[in-house]
């Protein structure tokens, strides 16, 4: 009987040891299986989970606009006073609802090329007003004229056309006109062929962004979704040195197995440059653990604060010899028009930029850009892209509408918040197919290992105790 009991205890200990060993073996083997599955499913080719969602996003994307309505246009034009603005919005559009087009796989270099059609549908229920709401804003054509045409004689001619068209420094426009374009009366009088339609995002509807050429990940999963070229080029021709490079992905996804220490690099055609995000915090999104990556303040810092930004400083006067920060001059990619990009309300901008403007209230929580990335797959499941469009206007002695100005203004026109969050149905599918299976595998591994160790220790203690008792 003693032998039977001892044998039973030994058998229990052996079973425990086997379970513990199996649990231990399952950890690396399970991780290998997960890694193999993920690598297969994030490749951008027909039949994978990634490809289906890549061709047409399953996430509803909204772009909200807040317009800066100028309250004292005459004071500014006559006395060069501070510009008083009042933010009005949001006015919401649904965007990025069209599938990618002209998708072409290249098996030779493991890339896939495409264009992204543009479209915007107004959402009245998510807006404070209609597309016919009017705003007092900077006259985009008048403000740009002295930047594009620097010759004094040409400016004299332009001044006569500005006066003839009854244009001034400021104008009243509807939301639809401001965003998507209007026939400008001044430009319509110019006696030689130039574009006469003006709008912050003109042209947009029925256009396409690209051609993009990205790596599909078949030969190297660490390159999946990374942009190989944009419009047939690997550089932008806007900036000097490495600032001109097209880096990273389009931010919709990143190579899998994202670590917190990784810097996520991505290219945005909206701001005509590549930029990056760094880890901010762990959060849970609809039951899915994600890493929140944020755009750091140093991305728009001056070269004095961040020497890596020296090649983004393209002129010395407006930037106070490259000491101002928080704005980016993108005029080179806007046909010479004096467009400056910043974070909303000049968040993280130097005081000299915001000093001539009253009515701004920068807020880190409301105005920062972030990406919520699921670390196993590298998919961006939620994002908020926030940026502000500004126009530089400066004194011009030959143009009466601008001759009374005594300072340069970087005038905020509007700011936008483009957001997307994985839907409930997609989130459930993601939990079931990805994170749920990984969690279950991890739980099984820990249960087997823990149960095996406990059984082994318990049965061995009992066996030793039993033998000790029998000897006595």
UniProtKB/Swiss-Prot annotation:
Intervals, Cytoplasmic compartment: 1-7, 462-472
Transmembrane found in the keyword field: yes
Annotated signal peptide: none
Site for Critical for TLR4-TLR6 dimerization and signaling, residues: 463
Glycosylation sites: 79, 102, 132, 205, 235, 247, 321, 417
Transmembrane intervals: 8-29, 440-461
Reactions catalysed: butanoate(out) = butanoate(in); (9Z)-octadecenoate(out) = (9Z)-octadecenoate(in); (9Z,12Z)-octadecadienoate(out) = (9Z,12Z)-octadecadienoate(in); tetradecanoate(out) = tetradecanoate(in)
Extracellular side: 30-439
Localisation per UniProt entry: Cell membrane; Membrane raft; Golgi apparatus; Apical cell membrane
Disulfide bonds listed in the record: 243-311, 272-333, 313-322
Cross-link type Glycyl lysine isopeptide (Lys-Gly) (interchain with G-Cter in ubiquitin), residue numbers: 469, 472
Spans annotated as Required for interaction with thrombospondins, THBS1 and THBS2: 93-120
One GO cellular component term noted in the UniProt record for this chain: membrane raft
Chief location of this protein within or outside the cell: membrane
Lipidation (S-palmitoyl cysteine): 3, 7, 464, 466
One Pfam family in the UniProt entry: CD36
Gene Ontology process terms (BP): amyloid fibril formation; amyloid-beta clearance by cellular catabolic process; cell adhesion; cellular response to diacyl bacterial lipopeptide; cellular response to low-density lipoprotein particle stimulus; cholesterol import; energy homeostasis; intestinal absorption
Post-translational changes noted in the entry: Palmitoylated by ZDHHC5. Palmitoylation is required for proper localization at the plasma membrane. Ubiquitinated at Lys-469 and Lys-472. Ubiquitination is induced by fatty acids such as oleic acid and leads to degradation by the proteasome. Ubiquitination and degradation are inhibited by insulin which blocks the effect of fatty acids.
GO function term, MF aspect, one: low-density lipoprotein particle receptor activity
Membrane topology: Multi-pass membrane protein
Function field: Multifunctional glycoprotein that acts as a receptor for a broad range of ligands. Ligands can be of proteinaceous nature like thrombospondin, fibronectin, collagen or amyloid-beta as well as of lipidic nature such as oxidized low-density lipoprotein (oxLDL), anionic phospholipids, long-chain fatty acids and bacterial diacylated lipopeptides. They are generally multivalent and can therefore engage multiple receptors simultaneously, the resulting formation of CD36 clusters initiates signal transduction and internalization of receptor-ligand complexes.
Family: Belongs to the CD36 family.
Complexes and interactors: Interacts with THBS1 and THBS2; the interactions mediate the THBS antiangiogenic activity. Upon interaction with a ligand, such as oxidized low-density lipoprotein (oxLDL) or amyloid-beta 42, rapidly forms a complex with TLR4 and TLR6; the complex is internalized and triggers an inflammatory signal. Through its C-terminus, interacts with PTK2, PXN and LYN, but not with SRC. LYN kinase activity is required for facilitating TLR4:TLR6 heterodimerization and signal initiation. Upon interaction with ligands such as diacylated lipopeptides, interacts with the TLR2:TLR6 heterodimer.
Protein known as: Platelet glycoprotein 4
Organism, scientific name: Mesocricetus auratus (Golden hamster)
